[in-house]
């Protein structure tokens, strides 16, 4: 296990040397969760406090730490942490032991590039280098039995051939959506688009076309989940596959490839039908997987699937129950049950009642501790996903000018107002204000939890310990930083462009 026991430096935050000494004793030397909680309370890191500046991670700092993990890139926060890596390759973490995450996962890379492409000023060179690196990955994956479902590659771009959970068919879908958004930003007639990204002739090996063809012909295949643990059918995988096919159909039409557009639309409709089967009406939440036993099905991957699988250009899609967007009643109902499942599970949560935010992990039954198996922990990406769903739902309500409460989502909304009832509340009404304000406060609570568990320099590992709050697992996880920036955009009423 790799565990970095680094906390904030209380003496910087406090004027009292005596109190600073007390905090050092509590934070640095105690493994007692209650003591750690008291320490956080004393230095103002309770979950309902305001934004934690300047010690805690900020969006710009997270973005720069994320960039530092890309081959050939240079950031203002640590330069480049992955020297010698293939240009444009996104490395999951600089950690090479305990655990070794020094690889380029297609999924992590695509999610990272979604954040890069969504910036106000586009770093075209960085994204082109990424696209070129992924083209090499595609070519190398062609020799694998998993094809474009090959999950990860060595730092030099060569195929990772060791034992692993294969295939992971969410990966090409995420990559396709990211690069379609990039193509739209630089212009569909740009030579890089027409030469590298999309050619209607599949034999030409263009990056987007290769992925869309793979997704459209293999979405029904059994696949490993995004956690790389279980094989079957997964909500997250299907959600992002459908998004890629919807994006791909529109893009193919624009690229004068009507036959492909028709086929992608047909397959997207079939995926949408399959997604409906994940709703568990008996338990009142979206199941994360099918064909997997021993789990409740409440899983962070559903939150991520809602965020990465909806059409961000269409606010109506965000509330449509059949679309499973982040503002839909079924996703919000699942959000409540997912968050509640961790309230008493982790000691650092102190069994806080709703509507308080708490640290969340992947799923209740998790035993991966960041390097081996013992007990699962809160993850930064999951706690941030819980925040981003709320921030996105509020943004959608503001954009639409109303908020709809159904019998399905009523328990979710009653966290914020005991008088909430099924119906539609117009923007400006007292109930609209009460509900959206409560959601924003809860979202800020999740972010404050994340910020209170970052290290003193603002860096984030993959996990933080369920009892002590210390960071552990892979250090400087690229996805953790991408998740922080993604949620920050949502909190400003912006969405990722992909």
Where do the language-model regions lie?
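Low-complexity, Ser/Thr/Pro/Gly-enriched N-terminal "stalk/linker" regions
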Residues: 36-104, 128-129, 133, 137-150, ...
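Extended ligand-binding clefts on enzyme/binding-domain cores
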Residues: 106, 139-170, 235-242, 254, ...
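Aromatic-rich carbohydrate-recognition surfaces in CAZymes
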Residues: 100-218, 238, 484
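Structural helix-adjacent loops and short alpha-helical linkers that scaffold large soluble proteins
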Residues: 50-60, 117-131, 182-209, 249-272, ...
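Glycine-rich, acidic and aromatic/proline-enriched surface loops and short helix-turn segments
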Residues: 68-82, 136-140, 178-185, 210-221, ...
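CBM-like carbohydrate-recognition segments
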Residues: 143-144, 149-154, 369-382, 408-498
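Fungal secretory targeting signals
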Residues: 1-48
């Amino acid at each position: 296990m790799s565990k970095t026991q680094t906390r904030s430096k209380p003496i910087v935050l406090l004027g009292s040397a005596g109190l600073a000494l007390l905090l050092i004793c509590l934070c640095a030397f105690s493994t007692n969760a209650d003591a750690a909680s008291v320490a956080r309370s004393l230095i103002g890191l309770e979950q309902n406090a305001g934004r934690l500046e300047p010690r805690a991670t900020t969006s710009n700092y997270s973005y720069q730490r994320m960039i530092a993990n890309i081959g050939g890139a240079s950031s203002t926060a640590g330069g480049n942490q992955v020297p010698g890596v293939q240009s444009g390759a996104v490395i999951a973490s600089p950690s090479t032991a305990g655990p070794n995450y020094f690889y380029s996962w297609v999924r992590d890379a695509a999610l990272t590039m979604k954040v890069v492409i969504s910036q106000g000023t586009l770093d075209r060179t960085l994204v082109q280098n990424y696209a070129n690196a992924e083209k090499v990955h595609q070519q190398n994956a062609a020799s694998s039995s998993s094809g474009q479902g090959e999950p990860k590659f060595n730092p030099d771009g060569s195929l990772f051939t060791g034992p692993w959970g294969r295939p992971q068919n969410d990966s090409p879908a995420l990559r396709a959506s990211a690069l379609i958004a990039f193509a739209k930003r630089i212009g569909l007639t740009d030579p890089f688009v027409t030469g590298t990204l999309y050619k209607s002739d599949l034999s030409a090996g263009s990056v987007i076309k290769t992925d869309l063809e793979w997704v459209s012909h293999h979405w029904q295949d059994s696949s490993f989940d995004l956690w790389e643990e279980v094989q079957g059918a997964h909500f997250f995988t299907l959600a992002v596959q459908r998004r890629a096919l919807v994006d791909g159909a529109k893009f193919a039409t624009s690229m004068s490839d009507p036959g492909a557009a028709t086929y992608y639309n047909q397959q997207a409709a079939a995926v949408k039908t399959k997604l409906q089967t994940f709703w568990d009406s008996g338990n009142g939440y979206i199941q994360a997987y099918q064909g997997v036993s021993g789990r409740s099905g409440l899983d962070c991957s559903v939150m991520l699937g809602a965020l990465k699988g909806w059409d961000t250009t269409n606010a109506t899609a965000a509330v449509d129950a059949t679309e499973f967007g982040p503002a839909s009643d079924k996703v919000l109902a699942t959000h409540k049950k997912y968050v509640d499942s961790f309230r008493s599970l982790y000691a650092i949560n102190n069994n806080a009642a709703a509507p308080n935010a708490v640290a969340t992990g992947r799923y209740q039954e998790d035993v991966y501790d960041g390097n081996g198996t013992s007990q699962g922990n809160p993850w930064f990406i999951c706690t941030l996903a819980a925040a981003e769903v709320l921030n996105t739902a509020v943004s959608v309500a503001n954009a639409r000018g109303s908020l709809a409460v159904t019998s399905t989502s009523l328990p979710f909304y009653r966290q914020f107002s005991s008088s909430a009832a099924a119906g539609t509340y117009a923007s400006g009404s007292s109930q609209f204000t009460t509900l959206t304000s409560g959601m924003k406060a809860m979202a800020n609570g999740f972010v404050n939890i994340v910020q209170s568990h970052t290290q003193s320099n603002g860096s984030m590992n993959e996990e933080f310990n369920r009892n002590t709050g210390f960071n552990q697992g892979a250090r400087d996880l690229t996805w953790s930083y991408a998740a922080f920036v993604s949620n920050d955009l949502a909190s400003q009423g912006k969405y990722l462009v992909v």
